[in-house]
């Protein structure tokens, strides 16, 4: 199987009204507005465009408004599946919680249907967590990719990685599923062990984006460093400019969108860099990234319908903000005993407070 190693913020938002939040900047972002913006000239072979490192609270609020605008109203004429059909590729004997968290978060964010494609020995456990998920015990089968491919035409977005594990068969099937998704022009959110797949085979997502399909990578700090080393051929400078490193990596991969998780999530498509500085809490329980990736898949589907420019940036920012707000609400009640299950219970309230919609 090979050696598996551990390995546009909208430049123009003229069509979007300025955000009029019910929250002050203090409550939303946890501090006074910072009015600093640094512009950089592109080193990309693409035509020169403004490079914006966003630390401006008003600019963040404007992006939040654009995220709000992509959320579809619930219409009487809708049928099941219109608001989103999401597939999660992951789940093995050791890790059954992660795919559940991602899939249930997609549903609670607003998707109509959520599928989990997992290994045969994890399917029963994942099914027992919720009757609302559609669980397919396929991932460890010899012809898994062919069977998963039959479902691709019915899905709007795939989340690859939650609970995938490091079994070579699972990793190989995840890799081939990404390749199939690319041929079928499907949106992708790649997280966790899916990042390990991309770290080993970065060519499978290089130049992935088109008008019909987008990909978002959601590495944490360690995963980002491994991916950076693999793609750039050198280690990331721990004292260097994190914004510039994220932008450079995105450019090298063909301007795919990266959401580098951290104290403040850094989001870039290689042309524009934005920061989500909405405050959560200092509690770092496992599984928060699964809530992020599941909700991000839904927003990516919505944004690609409503936004013609930088839909992946809008989706990544919306999901980042939602996850942080869930963390904040759950922590305010439970403090250090808070877990990701508690955060998921806050999705409804966080969604209403952050986006002003039911």
From Swiss-Prot:
Domain of life from the UniProt record: Eukaryota
GO biological process: metabolite repair; nicotinamide nucleotide metabolic process
UniProt catalytic activity: (6S)-NADHX + ATP = ADP + phosphate + NADH + H(+); (6S)-NADPHX + ATP = ADP + phosphate + NADPH + H(+)
Gene3D superfamilies the record matches: 3.40.1190.20
Cofactor(s) essential for the protein: Mg(2+)
UniProt: (6S)-NADPHX binding residues: 163, 220-226, 290
SUPFAM superfamilies linked to this entry: Ribokinase-like
Keyword tags: ATP-binding, Lyase, NAD, NADP, Nucleotide-binding, Phosphoprotein
Domain YjeF C-terminal: 63-354
GO molecular function, one term: ATP-dependent NAD(P)H-hydrate dehydratase activity
Residues binding ATP, per UniProt: 261-265, 280-289
Enzyme Commission no: 4.2.1.93
Described function: Catalyzes the dehydration of the S-form of NAD(P)HX at the expense of ATP, which is converted to ADP. Together with NAD(P)HX epimerase, which catalyzes the epimerization of the S- and R-forms, the enzyme allows the repair of both epimers of NAD(P)HX, a damaged form of NAD(P)H that is a result of enzymatic or heat-dependent hydration.
Family: Belongs to the NnrD/CARKD family.
HAMAP family in alphabetical order: NADHX_dehydratase
Name listed for the protein in its UniProt record: ATP-dependent (S)-NAD(P)H-hydrate dehydratase
């Amino acid at each position: 199987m090979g050696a598996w190693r551990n390995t546009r913020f909208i430049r123009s938002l003229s069509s979007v009204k300025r955000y009029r939040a019910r929250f002050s900047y203090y409550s939303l972002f946890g501090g006074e507005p910072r009015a600093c913006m640094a512009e950089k000239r592109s080193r990309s072979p693409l035509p020169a465009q403004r490079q914006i490192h966003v630390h401006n609270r008003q600019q963040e609020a404007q992006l939040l408004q654009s995220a709000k605008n992509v959320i579809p109203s619930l219409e009487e004429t809708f049928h099941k599946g219109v608001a989103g059909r999401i597939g999660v590729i992951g789940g093995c004997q050791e890790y059954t919680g992660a795919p559940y968290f991602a899939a249930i978060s997609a549903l609670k964010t607003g998707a109509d249907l959520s599928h989990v494609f997992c290994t045969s020995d994890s399917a029963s456990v994942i099914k027992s967590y919720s009757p609302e998920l559609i669980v397919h015990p396929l991932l460890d089968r010899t012809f898994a990719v062919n069977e998963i491919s039959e479902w691709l035409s019915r899905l709007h977005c795939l989340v690859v990685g939650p609970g995938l594990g490091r079994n070579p068969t699972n990793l190989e099937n995840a890799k081939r599923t990404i390749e199939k998704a690319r041929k079928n022009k499907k949106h992708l959110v790649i997280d966790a062990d899916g990042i390990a797949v991309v770290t080993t085979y970065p060519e499978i997502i290089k130049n992935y984006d088109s008008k019909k399909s987008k990909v978002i990578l959601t590495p944490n700090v360690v995963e980002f460093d491994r991916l950076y080393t693999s793609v750039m051929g050198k280690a990331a400078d721990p004292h260097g400019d994190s914004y510039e490193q994220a932008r450079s990596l995105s450019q090298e991969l063909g301007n795919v969108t990266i959401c580098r998780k951290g104290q403040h999530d850094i989001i870039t498509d290689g042309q524009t860099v934005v920061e989500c500085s909405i405050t959560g809490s200092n509690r770092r329980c496992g599984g928060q990234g699964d809530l992020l990736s599941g909700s991000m898949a839904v927003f990516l589907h919505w944004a690609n319908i409503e936004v013609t420019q930088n839909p992946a940036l809008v989706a990544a920012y919306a999901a980042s903000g939602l996850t942080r707000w869930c963390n904040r609400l759950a922590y305010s009640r439970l403090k250090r005993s808070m877990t990701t299950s508690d955060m998921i219970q806050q999705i409804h309230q966080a969604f209403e407070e952050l986006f002003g919609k039911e």
